[in-house]
Amino acid sequence: MPKLTHFDKKGRAKMVDVSKKGETLREAVVRGSIFMNPKTFKSILSGKIAKGDVLAVAKVAGIMAAKKTSEIIPMCHPLNLSHVEINFYPFEKESRIDIEAKVKIKAPTGVEMEGFVAVATAGLTIYDMCKAIDRGIVLSNIHLVKKTGGKSGTYTSKKFPSPGGRGITLLDKKL
């Protein structure tokens, strides 16, 4: 079992020293799902939510959150991210929207947590903008799909593979 690096010899929490680690290209893909009633789902996709364009706001919120991860998660290093991309995948039968964050950096530490914070924040933003019409919204299954780079190499989830396909972009919503 790998050693937990965020604890000292006495079991107290500490920030990992990454100063001697080399910079490598690191990427993380994190995904989560948000379930809602069919009316809310259709209202989001048709742009009929009173607070505005839900997915556009959720996208910006997710990107902003990724950049602020070290202010939320105590032992995360502050990072100058190279790229953050948020995509949404709608599934009408389940009244579900999958949220995916792709984060990239060349650094001595990974960006998985930035991906998790981006997905969670995008989902929470969707809830916030839609709670007036649907208090039963559920945000779930936030998980690491894939990570590359660093000493541990590549990890790809076998339990939650990415469904593929093309996500909704802001241009798609304007059609």
Task: Map each language-model feature to its residues.
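C-terminal binding/interaction regions
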Residues: 1-55, 60-77, 83-160, 170-175
